[in-house]
Amino acid sequence: MPNLSFVIPAYNEQDSLAELHQQIATVAADNSYDFEIVFVDDGSTDDTWKIIESLSTANENVKAIMLRGNYGKAAALRAGAKMSTGDLIITMDADLQDDPAEVPKMLAALTDDFDLVSGWKEVRNDPVNKTMPSKVFNWLVGLLTGVRLHDHNCGFKVYRREIFDEVKLYGEMHRFVPVLAAAKGFRVTEIPVNHRARQHGVSKYGLKRLPKGFLDLLTVSFLTGFNQRPLHLLGMFGLATFSVGAFGMFAMAIYWILRMVAYPEWTPLHQRPVVLYSVGLLILGTQLLSMGFLAELIVAKGQSREEPYSIAKKLE
C-alpha cells in the first residue's frame, strides 16, 4: 500500500482534533497503512494550535503548519499538500463529519482507472439551508463544466499526488479541484460516503458563500474552457457588441431615410435615452466581463510562482 498523507485544514476546531486523530490512527492500524497527518491551522482564534502541537509532540507522524491568518481552505490545502510526502493525499474536514472509516473504501475505488476519488454525502446531516443551495450549485457545476458529480463541495477526497503538483489552488477554488483536475486530463470518480452530524462547534459556511461560489464557477468555466484560447470567449462578446452597434447604426440609417421622406416630426433615434443607455450598458458590461476574466487568467497563472499564504510555524 502506498504511503498516505492526510491533509486536514482546521479553523477553530479545538474540540474535534484529538478525537479525529484517534479515529484516523485506528483505521490506519487496522489496515496496516503507512501514514502521516498534516494539520493546517488556518488562523484559528481558539486553542486549535495548542491541540495540534500536543498531537505533534506525542506522535512523530503528525506534522503541522500554522498560517499567519485565515487564508481560506484552498490555501490551507495547498500548504498542507506541499508539506506532505505521501504518494496519495487524503483531504478531509476537521469537524468529525467526515468518517475516517470510509478511507479503505475510497482507496479501493482509486484503481488504475482513476486519479481522484471524491466523496458523495448521499445522506447529509445538515440543515436544508445548506443542502438545497448545494444541490443547485452541483447542478450548475455539471452544466457549465461537464464534470458531473453529486457533491463537488465534499472535502473528503483521495488524490494521486500529481494532481496537487499540477493543479494550483488559490482563492476559494478547493471545491473545483475535480473540475480543474479533469481539465488537465486526470480521471475523476465519486462514491457515497458516510456523513456524520457535527458534534462540536459551528459550521463556518452558509448562504453568504453562494454569490462567491457562483462567481468562482464562472471563473473556473472560463479557465477550463478558454485558458489557452481566450479570444474565443472575448471574441464572442466583441461580436455581440459589434452586432448591437451595427444594428443601431442600421436603425438610424433607416430612420433618417424615413424622416427625410415622410416623418420629419419623429424624435431622432440618437436622442432617445433608452436606446443610448442600453447600448452604453451593453458595452460597459462587456468591457467589465472581459477585464474580469483577463484578471482571473493573470492571477491563475501567477499562482504557480507565488504562494497565497504566509506560514508562521511548522512542526515536522
Where on the chain are the PLM-derived regions?
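Short, well-formed alpha-helical segments that are part of the catalytic scaffolds
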Residues: 13-28
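Acidic helix N-cap motif at the loop->helix transition within catalytic regions
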Residues: 15-19, 46-55
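A conserved acidic beta->alpha catalytic loop
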Residues: 41-50, 96-97
